Amino acid sequence: MKRRSTAPADKFTARVLTAARRIPPGRVATYGDVAAMAGRPRAARAVGNIMRTCGRADVPCHRVIAAGGRIGGYVGRETFKRALLAAEGLIVSGGRVRDFDRVRWPQRKR
């Protein structure tokens, strides 16, 4: 039986996974935020695809959400993503993270 490699397929994927690991517990970042942290600010969709298929225990994929605080998809189920966020003190209501602007990381200047 072949062992599946846990190494990222390319440099951008590696940068995305590194950026996602930097998101602190109890905070969230959007796919666009992570794309910018990984050096490709217009690659939000690519980040979404990477997060959707990640499934690695060392990457907190559940902290990466869609624009406007929508929780988006998850390699597990949406209910599992909600539970992981709730375990970190975040509240999801109506498919969105409550107080999104306050818990978004990194904080945006107003």
Question: Where on the chain are the PLM-derived regions?
Answer:
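Nucleic acid-binding interface residues in structured DNA/RNA-binding domains
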Residues: K2-R110
